[in-house]
Amino acid sequence: MRRALSLLGVVLALCAATPSAQTPPKTLDIYYVDTEGGQATPFVSPTGQTVLVDTGNANPPGRDPQRIMEAMKAAGAKQIDYLVMTHYHGDHVGGFEELAKLTKIAHIIDHGPTVQPEQKHDAYDQALKTTPYTVAKPGDKVPVTGIDWLIVSAAGKTLKTNVAGAPGAGKPNPYCAEFKPKDIQSDLENGQSTGSLITYGKFRTIDLGDLLWNVEFDLMCPTNRIGTVDLYLTSHHGVDWSGSSTLVHALAPRVAIMNNGTRKGGQIAVDEVLESSPGLEDLWQLHWSFNGVTEHNPPGRFIANIEDAATTAAIVANPPPPATQPLGPPVPRAGGAGGAGGRAGGPAAAAPGAPQLGNPAHSPAYWLKVSAQNDGTFTVFNPRNGFSKTYKPRS
């Protein structure tokens, strides 16, 4: 009996000495909040710090800030330790005023003065007078414990040194040879976007805001300074002013997430670049895309928000004309959302006779959640249908 008790004691002691076997690994959690074609992305570090990239739209009033708060509550986040504002179009900064009433924003990081004075936001400008504030430059770090947050673009400038230790960084980019510049107005806030490369152990993800096509060349050529990534947030919501093969194919992401709206982004040219990207396993989207029609949307389990069956049938029966993007001045910020149909704001208007899609206040609205481990494993979860997929580290 004593021998049996002694052996039992050894077993219990061993179990007590190895709690890690029972404890889930700490993760970097990312919530791609549905802002109907804008951006609001909370990152919650393994130590509990929260970095929010952008604040979504102003209209409908309170919608996007409330969705951000719901994601933060789900993550157990108490405040925003750092707000990284990519640029000042209404679909990225519009929710700031209401969000600041709902939670503490401890520190703001942005690219500095706007290049489009008509895009000024008084509440944001006032907050900069009382909130700790940093103007980002390529090469700067956001001091988040346990992860490496590197600024790779800001104010039209890009990183000029190779990311130390990054897989593939410093090698010639073969996709530079196929780059063709686009005739895109250069003095836009999009091209000023504060872009971030976030690394947690062996997991790497990149968020470039709305960085423009021609600036992507400056970042990635002639040398790939970034290296490869595991997860790519499609630039500019999947609008074809961004997302060149020179960028995407060199990054060689395993997974892409598109923060599109029903009628904004998801353009076929962007989809084709993704579909031909070496090593891409899956595309996830916040919305079923009218622009992508049936041929280019991913399977439904990879989409956070889907229209009802009757609306989807109408989309299939009435495919849209080829999408175009205006090259003229920005549409005025009606209600602070960057314009109703311009490149900077909410979903584009439906073509005459096309089905009206995308209830802008629909509820519930679903995010996509990514949980990344420091060994490079990450899982994408779709709460609409409970579907998740885990991606093991690159071999």
Locate each region found by the language model.
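Flexible, acidic/histidine-containing loops and adjacent segments that form or flank the divalent-metal
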Residues: Q22-L28, V93-D218, S276-D282, H287-R394
